[in-house]
């Protein structure tokens, strides 16, 4: 991989060097934009957005093919809003990202993009996303805007650097993707839409606290008051188990989705709770945090994909 510090702004293509090509520079540029947008976060959240869309179609008694344009607008809008929020997060955190191993290669740290460029890209993505959501229903656009405000202002600009409650605040914004998806089809928001929201809300603290445990020294160096940094691992474990325990009955409230869903949700939930409780006896806290982190990713993916499958 080329480790050159040469800027890859399109205006600097000529200066890229004799061994570079326009295609190489463009490829790097697109990769950098994907890093700014936090592609992994956007992709995983689009799964939950699609689940919200599909379930709304099912429970409004309409036909999937009638909503193809709405689905495209909703997915594109949600993706852009999330990408915009993540890009703005990169812009705001550019002064501390160099202190953390997992963020030190972001384009805002390496200088591949100027701060002004990143700010403009983030604002443009967010604005376009809200416009696309508005083409579905006003409710979807409002929810997207609220989620964006919570993530960028209340989380990134305020609580992330000031309180251990940052994870809870961020969980509100992280829980809106399925709500956006449902609202794009049905602005009235069925009870099931809110249950999807609460599942996402309760899932996020144990997921991100596991990450915080894994990266505790990096967060400490960056001065970010994550719970493991401020209160230690034991308190963090207790809070993680509380959220996992609360998530189990909420996920089972969707028992009308059928026996297969109910059984799988119960097994997934009990398994995660058992792993959480096992953490109080494991000697290697970091290993346990890794297991919890991986389990959380599998839990979310399996649960939301299953919600769609059982309704085919």
From Swiss-Prot:
Cytoplasmic side: 1-36, 89-110, 158-228, 276-296
Main location: membrane
CDD domains: PT_UbiA_Cox10
Top enzyme class: transferase
GO biological process, one term: heme O biosynthetic process
A Pfam family per the record: UbiA
Catalytic activity: heme b + (2E,6E)-farnesyl diphosphate + H2O = Fe(II)-heme o + diphosphate
Domain of life: Bacteria
Transmembrane portions of the chain: 37-55, 70-88, 111-129, 139-157, 229-247, 260-275, 297-307
Pathway where this protein functions: Porphyrin-containing compound metabolism; heme O biosynthesis; heme O from protoheme: step 1/1
UniProt entry keywords in alphabetical sequence: Cell membrane, Heme biosynthesis, Membrane, Transferase, Transmembrane, Transmembrane helix
Record PROSITE patterns: UBIA
Signal sequence residues: none
Membrane topology: Multi-pass membrane protein
Any GO molecular function: protoheme IX farnesyltransferase activity
EC nos: 2.5.1.141
Entry's localization field: Cell membrane
Gene3D superfamilies membership: UbiA prenyltransferase
PANTHER family named in the record: PROTOHEME IX FARNESYLTRANSFERASE, MITOCHONDRIAL
Protein name: Protoheme IX farnesyltransferase
Species classification: Bacteria, Bacillati, Bacillota, Bacilli, Bacillales
